[in-house]
């Protein structure tokens, strides 16, 4: 019984930190902005925080789940087609290293998330304190083409499929279980494999700000200047 109580408190603390980070990020959004909305449990707290501000926003969602949740709160969501740049994109993370490398994609939407992040003038990552790590660890999410899948898996090595999981765009979702102490090298390995649509390693230069909630406080790591 005591063990269960401690575990529940820990979960409550994590959820509180997700909310704190999300609310801090919502303050970065200006009225009239074109906003990229990520996917995941931390973004779930961002949506009501944005809705409560009552801003006039034009949003692009990275998954059907985020799009549906945003619309339910009265947030305008539009297709990404025809939108060349976003003012800001906000998303969660699975792991955040001290040097700014980030792992994303536990939910299988990392290809869309990476496209949206790259299109944003300012990409902001939000997370609870348990996502801050000393060294990145496997697994690293991958989206793969179904064509030539066995050859791709053989070239990648140490990669397992997530059963029948598919991305929002139909790609095969897999996880790389090899060492990732050198994220730049691992990223290059993925990029050199033709069957890899996208991977969950996000380099430091892609991110402008990281907001990590620690209790009621928010640690703000500035990684890069927002694009002009």
Where are these regions (language model features)?
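A short, structure-level motif marking secondary-structure boundaries and short turns
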Residues: 10, 32, 50-53, 138
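Glycine-rich helix-loop-beta junction characteristic of Rossmann-like nucleotide cofactor-binding loops
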Residues: 25-30
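Glycine-rich loop at the start of a catalytic domain that most often binds anionic cofactors/ligands
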Residues: 47-56, 71-75
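Conserved phosphate- and dinucleotide-binding cores of soluble alpha/beta proteins
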Residues: 2-16, 65-228
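Short active-site oxyanion
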Residues: 32-35, 54-59, 101
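Glycine-rich beta-strand-to-loop/alpha-helix junction loops that act as flexible
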Residues: 37-42
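A short, well-structured juxtamembrane/interface segment
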Residues: 18-24
């Amino acid at each position: 019984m005591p063990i269960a109580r401690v575990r529940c408190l820990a979960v409550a603390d994590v959820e509180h930190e997700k909310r704190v980070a999300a609310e801090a990020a919502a303050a970065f959004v200006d009225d009239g902005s074109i906003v990229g909305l990520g996917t995941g449990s931390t973004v779930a707290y961002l949506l009501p925080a944005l809705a409560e501000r009552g801003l006039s926003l034009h949003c692009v969602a990275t998954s059907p789940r985020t799009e549906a949740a945003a619309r339910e709160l009265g947030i305008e969501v539009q297709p990404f087609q025809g939108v060349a740049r976003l003012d800001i994109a906000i998303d969660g993370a699975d792991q955040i290293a001290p040097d700014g490398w980030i792992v994303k994609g536990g939910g299988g939407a990392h290809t869309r998330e990476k496209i949206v992040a790259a299109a944003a003038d300012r990409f902001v990552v939000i997370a609870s304190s348990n996502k801050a790590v000393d060294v990145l660890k496997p697994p690293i999410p991958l989206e793969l083409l179904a064509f030539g899948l066995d050859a791709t898996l053989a070239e990648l090595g140490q990669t397992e499929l997530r059963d029948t999981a598919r991305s929002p765009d139909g790609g095969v979702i897999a996880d790389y279980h090899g060492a990732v102490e050198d994220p730049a090298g691992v990223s290059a390995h993925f990029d050199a494999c033709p069957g890899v649509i996208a991977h969950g390693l996000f380099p430091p230069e892609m991110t402008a700000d990281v907001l990590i909630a620690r209790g009621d406080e928010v640690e703000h790591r500035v990684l890069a200047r927002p694009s002009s």
